[in-house]
Structure formats: C-alpha cells, structure tokens
C-alpha cells in the first residue's frame, strides 16, 4: 500500500522540472547553470526513492506473511516439543523480517526528507519571486 505522502515529492519534482524553462528566463546565466545542475540531481534521487519504496513494500509483505506463519505455529506450540521449536524458529524469522522492514522504512523516510529539502532549496533558489 503506497502512502500519499510519498507521492507528493514526486509530483512536486515533476512540476519543478516542467517549470525550469520559465524560471530560467528570470535568472542570470550563472544561476541558470546552477539550477540546471540542481535539477539534474532531482531525477536520480526520485528514482532512488521509487526503488526504496518498492523494497520497503516487498519487505512489508514478507514480514506480514512471516507474521501469519508465526501465528499459525504459535497455535500449535503446546502440542509437542517439535511444534515449540518450529514456533521459535518462525518467531526468529518474523523478528528478522520486522527489523529489515523497519530499517527500510527508516531509510525511505530519511531519503524522502532529504529529497523534500532538495526540492525546497530548488524552489527557493530557482523559482522567481512573484
């Protein structure tokens, strides 16, 4: 499930990329070059965010599936010692998947925050005041 807050930076970047020619008319040649350089960094960062989002989503699905497997194994825990061992193994896998998901989520949020800051810097520097 994609979050609307992750889509917003992408839409902002697209609008900014389309607005560069209009903004360039009001800037000096030196500022225009700097803005073009800033603009060139936005697309790769946007692609990285998309990849990170896909990775996070895949890890979320994996953690969810392992969580369900753990719950199923937990129900049978008291039936035998082998079921208890299976439940312990399922819990360990689930915990590992949750940690991987949490790390991916944190990295994605950090990258999105930085991307939003870069877009704000671009807007501040490269968009003429009205």
Question: Which residues make up each language-model segment?
Answer:
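N-terminal secretory signal peptides that target proteins for export/translocation
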Residues: 1-6
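Sec-dependent N-terminal signal peptides
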Residues: 7-18
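Amphipathic alpha-helical coiled-coil segments
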Residues: 48-52, 56, 89-128
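Short E/K-rich amphipathic alpha-helical oligomerization segments
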Residues: 57-100
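Immediate post-signal-peptide N-terminus of mature secreted/exported proteins
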Residues: 24-73
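General structural signal for secondary-structure boundaries
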Residues: 14-15, 28, 34, 125
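Short coil/loop "hinge" linkers that interrupt or connect long alpha-helical coiled-coils or helical hairpins
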Residues: 30, 129-130
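N-terminal signal peptide c-region/cleavage motif recognized by signal peptidases
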Residues: 19-23
């Amino acid at each position: 499930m994609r979050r609307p807050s992750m889509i917003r930076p992408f839409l902002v970047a697209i609008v900014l990329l389309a607005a560069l020619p209009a903004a360039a008319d009001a800037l000096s040649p030196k500022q225009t070059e700097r803005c073009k350089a800033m603009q060139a960094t936005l697309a790769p960062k946007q692609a990285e965010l998309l990849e990170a989002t896909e990775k996070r989503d895949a890890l979320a699905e994996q953690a969810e599936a392992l969580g369900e497997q753990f719950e199923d194994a937990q129900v049978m825990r008291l039936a035998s010692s082998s079921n208890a061992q299976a439940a312990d193994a399922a819990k360990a896998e689930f915990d590992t998947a949750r940690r991987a998901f949490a790390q991916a989520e944190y990295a994605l949020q950090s990258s999105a925050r930085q991307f939003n800051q870069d877009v704000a810097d671009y807007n501040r520097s490269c968009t003429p005041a009205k």
